[in-house]
UniProtKB/Swiss-Prot annotation:
Mutagenesis / variant outcome for changing R127L: Increased thermal stability; loss of argininosuccinate synthase activity
Modified residue annotations for N6-acetyllysine: K112, K165, K176
Result when mutating G390R: In CTLN1; loss of argininosuccinate synthase activity
Species assigned in the record: Homo sapiens (Human)
Protein's UniProt name: Argininosuccinate synthase
Impact reported for M302V: In CTLN1; no effect on affinity for aspartate; no effect on affinity for citrulline; decreased argininosuccinate synthase activity
Residues that hold L-aspartate according to the record: T119, N123, D124
Pfam families recorded: Arginosuc_syn_C, Arginosuc_synth
InterPro entries xrefs: Arginosuc_syn_C, Arginosuc_syn_N, Arginosuc_synth, Arginosuc_synth_CS, Arginosuc_synth_type_1_subfam, AS_cat/multimer_dom_body, Rossmann-like_a/b/a_fold
Sites where the protein binds ATP: 10-18, 36, 115-123
Length: 412
């Protein structure tokens, strides 16, 4: 069979993408396997050997951890992004980062196709493909789980296992957990399997990034986190003096401390972009600490009205990231506006991390809008109390008129 051309497969080394690799070869493609090191616990060399053994023409293992932190996580921290009030977007942020490198490899290797193992019901198919089409409009995407010839052949995990046996694909000796997991530097997600029943509690042993808060240390870690332009630039453990200043090391250290204290666990039902609700359990240790610390220093340094506008932009940013529009012009515009709002978000925040909680202890900033003398109950400062009378009278006018009308309506 003559080759249909080269395809760059986003490969994880797991059962699904290993079967997809072999299946793509069956279809006549030359497969280039691409593994993104985005902070997950993975034996990358073992995955490389496995991909080559299964017939991959080339294997690229790309460490994108630092750019993931600096170019994707930091903008999310600046924006205080939460999807539907709770989800810190760990998976959503990783996908455009992974896809960007996948497209780079495809262009460098002259591949016309890219492929992924995302299911036809989830958000990731959208995130991967919108990123790929944005960065390389001529690229063609092969999405096996949306192709009838694939999903009619592989109707479940048992079919994949049988295919793996037939084609010499190594199968894990230990039974797979009855749920799916996806990990990166920012978080780990758990879904599907027994978790599809939203009533089922997370089974013991599910969580891997964080300690059970009930079993966490009884003594807190006190951290001082320094921000410049809304980005963390230094973290210091006040108790033992440990300091980290580079982005990746800082983030990894916060993951370690937060994980030890059981910080960052959530169990939610969310609305997928394609229209269905899904249940997800997430651990986002460092991201949770930084969310709270950044929120505090931002409130301390940012003008009230600017912050109201910025909060709206943060909601839009979260929606765009969740739905896969990272590379869209509107998301670029929103990121630029948020970055502008962060120019004076500078200072230090002290936090206590204890038994699943993050407590703000104090903050300081050379650019704070907080005026201790002005707000003091003991010092009048540059404020005339009698001015408040007119302020209250003007603001009460609208309320008086509204209730005057209500009285008339009620009387009738």
């Amino acid at each position: 069979m003559s080759s249909k051309g080269s395809v760059v497969l986003a490969y994880s080394g797991g059962l699904d993408t290993s079967c997809i690799l072999v299946w793509l070869k069956e279809q006549g493609y030359d497969v280039i396997a691409y593994l993104a090191n985005i902070g997950q616990k993975e034996d990358f060399e073992e995955a490389r050997k496995k991909a080559l053994k299964l017939g991959a023409k080339k294997v690229f293992i790309e460490d994108v951890s630092r750019e993931f932190v600096e170019e994707f996580i930091w903008p999310a921290i600046q924006s205080s992004a939460l999807y539907e009030d709770r989800y810190l977007l760990g998976t959503s942020l990783a996908r455009p980062c992974i896809a960007r490198k996948q497209v780079e490899i495809a262009q460098r290797e002259g591949a016309k196709y890219v492929s992924h193992g995302a299911t036809g019901k989830g958000n990731d198919q959208v995130r991967f493909e919108l990123s790929c089409y944005s960065l390389a409009p001529q690229i063609k995407v092969i999405a096996p789980w949306r192709m009838p010839e694939f999903y009619n052949r592989f109707k479940g995990r048992n079919d994949l296992m049988e295919y793996a046996k037939q084609h010499g694909i190594p199968i894990p000796v230990t039974p797979k957990n009855p749920w799916s997991m996806d990990e990166n530097l920012m978080h780990i997600s758990y879904e599907a399997g027994i978790l599809e029943n939203p009533k089922n509690q997370a089974p013991p042993g599910l969580y891997t990034k964080t300690q059970d808060p009930a079993k966490a240390p009884n003594t807190p870690d006190i951290l001082e986190i320094e921000f410049k332009k809304g980005v963390p630039v230094k973290v210091t453990n006040v108790k033992d003096g440990t300091t980290h200043q580079t982005s990746l090391e800082l983030f990894m250290y916060l993951n370690e401390v937060a994980g030890k204290h059981g910080v960052g666990r959530i169990d939610i039902v969310e609305n997928r972009f394609i229209g269905m609700k899904s249940r997800g359990i997430y651990e986002t240790p460092a991201g949770t600490i930084l969310y709270h610390a950044h929120l505090d220093i931002e409130a301390f340094t940012m003008d009230r009205e600017v912050r109201k506008i910025k909060q709206g932009l943060g909601l839009k940013f979260a929606e765009l990231v969740y739905t896969g529009f990272w590379h869209s012009p509107e998301c670029e515009f929103v990121r630029h506006c948020i970055a502008k709002s962060q120019e004076r978000v500078e200072g230090k925040v002290q936090v206590s991390v204890l038994k699943g909680q993050v407590y703000i202890l104090g903050r300081e900033s050379p650019l704070s809008l907080y005026n201790e003398e002005l707000v003091s109950m003991n010092v009048q400062g540059d404020y005339e109390p009698t001015d408040a009378t007119g302020f209250i009278n003007i603001n009460s006018l609208r309320l008086k008129e509204y209730h005057r009308l209500q009285s008339k309506v009620t009387a009738k």
